[in-house]
């Protein structure tokens, strides 16, 4: 399992330049004859395209009033088949408050002719808190090379931009570099790859007249990761690197951030506690919808049905909430997460052991429990216990029956955010009415043949 390491702005300062520096990346528009004449690659002869290189350079900068980060990305792809032309349609995701600018893209035909993308071809879409910059490169044909570059700017320094070293097609070179200021310390998490020691370069910050370190992670000749049946998300399988702030230490201030699961639980509990309350209107709902005269399971069911049916669902929501349960009740509208926190609040006022439960939905990927990383979670459910029974509830969809979760919530584990150190729980599986069991005992021969026996059992 991948274990976190740490970097700071001055880490490895004494061993600078002992390792090789970053590879020389061709400038935008400088496409070689070899790239133009390529018709296939020996590593993947059936490939529809090949990622010639995908390079990201991230840097934390110090402005006059704030710190911020910039990330410059440069991607070049060779189109090998008709199907490969689909890669000319590009979608760049970004957090809704981030900015993308200096976007350039063009197509280089096999004869060397360049077709520049019109800036009017770029448009933007938003889904919940995520934006997408979308465009289609012009004049793409088999044998062409497509290339684009852009800059992302963000004020969000808690988690640096993650990086995936693998794509849907074979990747010749994937490289990510990070420059942080001396005040910042980050934990580094690897997934689906062995931990990599970064290469380092010594650079000069001309504004502050100080030395900084550029950390470089590079992977070459990476096989493609393609969508397969029953696969939740490609991100469960792609080699990746993630960053989460560990500390900030300047001459004037010091702040310690998340370093383990209890830290994470404490931080999120403080956020939710700031919104939980015992407002009169909430108590009145408990008394009217779930009086003490009802049995406990029925009270839980009644409160669930009230929030599900009487509060309109806006966006899906993320981990955090912007409106308190009192405000959600007053507006009769909230995100899925805000509705679930309202349910938690009502259950607590009704005397139940109830807490927020963080999960990573199916499309977001599986949780790595050895990595205390907040960005692994993208949604929050309501969790309650009564006696030996556990209830995990999501009020987002009006069609969802009591104690039955929507498909995207059907994951293995969730993190209980209680007033202690929290902990992972197994999310109850729905009762199966029909089931198919398959068991195979197979032997793979040196010639590549599978021999053995299979047993199939139907139930229900």
Model-flagged regions — what are they?
Residues 103-164, 200-238, 439-441:
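A surface-exposed beta-strand-loop module
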Residues 23-36, 153-158, 166-168, 175-316, ...:
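Secretory-pathway-linked proteins and extracytosolic
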Residues 312-334:
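Short, conserved helix/loop micro-motifs enriched in His/Cys and acidic residues
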Residues 337-428:
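Hydrophobic/aromatic-rich core segments of domains that either
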Residues 23-92, 429-458:
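Early extracytoplasmic/domain-onset interaction patches
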Residues 75, 144-146, 176-178, 303, ...:
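Cysteine-centered nucleophilic/redox motifs
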Residues 8-17:
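Bacterial N-terminal signal peptides
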Residues 92-117, 173-188:
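Solvent-exposed beta-hairpin/edge-strand motifs
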